[in-house]
Amino acid sequence: MSGKRDKLAQTRLYGIADLGYLEEAALEDSVAALLEGGVDLIQLRAKNVAEGRILAFAQRIAPLCKAAGVPLIINDLVSVARQSEAAGVHLGQADGPLSSAWSALGHGAIVGRSTHSVLQARTALRQGADYIGFGPLFPTPTKEG
């Protein structure tokens, strides 16, 4: 089993630092609280935010994650994951093929996929997704149910 697969197999708590819910000024403190709380992986999610700003946010929290030995995953943006030296990327259904993410980030990168049906989950697994996310099951302020 590869290092990333070992890490994912041991992952029990996947934290999401979502700027749709967090104040930008609270990002580092929120990530620090997630790390102190024992998360095994953190995803930075910032829908409807300019790519340059997301990169700046990623660069602010990457050192915290690295110091804690917790992989940082960037939502949707392979380019930000690459530039911020994140551990990987989480892709939605419309965010391109998984193979393109590995081409850009290397095969050691963690690449996950959002799924909303059994068919999408099976497709993601066939394409080699390192993990799949399910949902949303219920509507939220940033996602329909």
Spans of features found by a protein language model:
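Conserved N-terminal beta1-alpha1 strand-loop-helix module at the mouth
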Residues: 1-95, 103-130
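Short glycine-rich, flexible loops that bind phosphorylated cofactors or substrates
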Residues: 98, 120, 140-141
